[in-house]
């Protein structure tokens, strides 16, 4: 396995670790509605950071975006919006299925759809079937799915042991939302694929290869911001017990604390895709769709490890922890299989 591929896998791991930890600051926010908290964090992660970093990277910000016609930008934006819909469905999936089953189904579907649909759309799915490297990476995808399934089972055992139940368990509604979440969340993978002309244009301007994907986030995350912020603002305006005015009528120290914590959560959320771009840049071009598989499987891996570090599994007993450990090992094996496939 080459150093470039090893570093690509490593950066995807770092990005996934940030994704697994980003909600921790949000949990410390007090006396704010979820909608206000999510909006403040979202403004930082989907608007301020993509624009600020792109402005630093690009020699002429407006000239860069002005060179693309609508036929290039619109698919990137719409796939970003598609991914934004997946974000919203994610929370609803957890409500109706519970954390373990919801994450397992949603992540499993988005891993398959986001990874395998891209080569199908590009017309090079035969690379997966008819080359040794392609078959190895395909095997890695399915091993990763097995790992996700094992971690999901560990979560179910933990919830059963600790008496944790879904907020409003509804299997039919939850499964529908989980499938929708999995499909729509793959929009980020599709957006990155559609944004290749933007990446190439950034490279032509002399932007470091590690950073060439970052300017496209202005458009991708703009689509996600439209959906997420629109959803939050509509609820803040229409739901009677929600009020942004009330949220900002608290004591000033608490408001400042909530803003800073939400902004920190937004920063950590953005960093997952900052390092995703670094990892993506190191993956061989013919296997770039594997970035999504690495990100999502590492997200499950890191989520389990973070839970252990935070002692969320302390009272779960030995069996759930043993099953979780097995699932994490399987995901690590899957990443190595994919790495070897990309190197062959």
Swiss-Prot record:
Keyword RNA-binding: no
Subcellular location: Cell inner membrane
GO molecular function: rhamnose transmembrane transporter activity; symporter activity
Transmembrane helix among keywords: yes
GO cellular component, one term: plasma membrane
Chief site of localization: membrane
Reaction equations catalysed: L-rhamnopyranose(in) + H(+)(in) = L-rhamnopyranose(out) + H(+)(out)
InterPro entries: L-rhamnose-proton_sym_RhaT
Record key words, sorted: Cell inner membrane, Cell membrane, Membrane, Sugar transport, Symport, Transmembrane, Transmembrane helix, Transport
Transmembrane intervals: 4-24, 38-58, 68-88, 101-121, 137-157, 175-195, 214-234, 259-279, 290-310, 321-341
Record membrane topology: Multi-pass membrane protein
Secretion signal span: none
Family that this chain belongs to: Belongs to the L-rhamnose transporter (TC 2.A.7.6) family.
Database matches in NCBIfam families: PRK13499.1-1, PRK13499.1-3, RhaT
HAMAP family named among the record's database cross-references: RhaT
Protein's job: Uptake of L-rhamnose across the cytoplasmic membrane with the concomitant transport of protons into the cell (symport system).
Protein name: L-rhamnose-proton symporter
